[in-house]
Amino acid sequence: MRLSYFILILFLAAAACSTPGKNLGANGWTDDFGQAGFDAAIGAESDPTSIAFFQKSVGDRVYFNVDEFTLNKDSKAALDIQAQWLTENPTYLAVIEGHADEQGTREYNLALGFRRARSVQEYLVAKGVSLLRLKTLSFGKERPAEICSSERCYSKNRRVVSILNAGTM
């Protein structure tokens, strides 16, 4: 009887130590949040339906002025192209990431990044992209594109990036 309990406890302990497998998606593996891993296939830049084409030719980001979340003329033009591509490629979902520069508090920049992401989301929905295909989140100043304390870096960090995923969120 003791041996049975010992084997059961040993089995449960071993199972608790195992790591879950990777989630396989259409474009490689994804984590528990549906984000593509570093080895995910993004397709060829020459394939107009690929993530690589979207990033290179369509453009995956728009920029903002200091302390602003309203879209300027250049941002709207870039988002018009994104909206058209997303409409023509309905199998993709987008995570819209809002970012801010390092100026200001963490809390303020998280809120500003969220407002920026929401303004992009609302614009894409107004252009015909289904709200069900769009998810917003904010990183505030936590994930800078460039690190330095100059306006050149700040302007690169005040952005929204559209990250594509194939499948469900």
Where are these regions (language model features)?
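N-terminal targeting leaders that direct proteins to extracytoplasmic destinations
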Residues: M1-S57, T70, A77, G167-M169
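Surface-exposed loop/turn and secondary-structure junction residues enriched for glycine/proline
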Residues: S4, R61, N65-D67, D74, ...
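Intrinsically disordered, low-complexity acidic/polar segments
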Residues: K22-N23, K73, T105, A145
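N-terminal start-of-chain detector that recognizes signal peptides
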Residues: F33-G37, G43, N65-E68, Q82, ...
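Extracytoplasmic/periplasmic, Sec-exported soluble proteins
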Residues: S46, D67-S75, E88, G104, ...
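Alpha-helical scaffolding within the catalytic cores
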Residues: P48-T49, I81, S149
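Periplasmic peptidoglycan-binding/anchoring modules of Gram-negative envelope and division proteins
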Residues: A52, S57, Y63-E97, Q121-A126, ...
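Periplasmic OmpA-like peptidoglycan-binding domain that tethers envelope proteins to the cell wall
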Residues: H99-T168
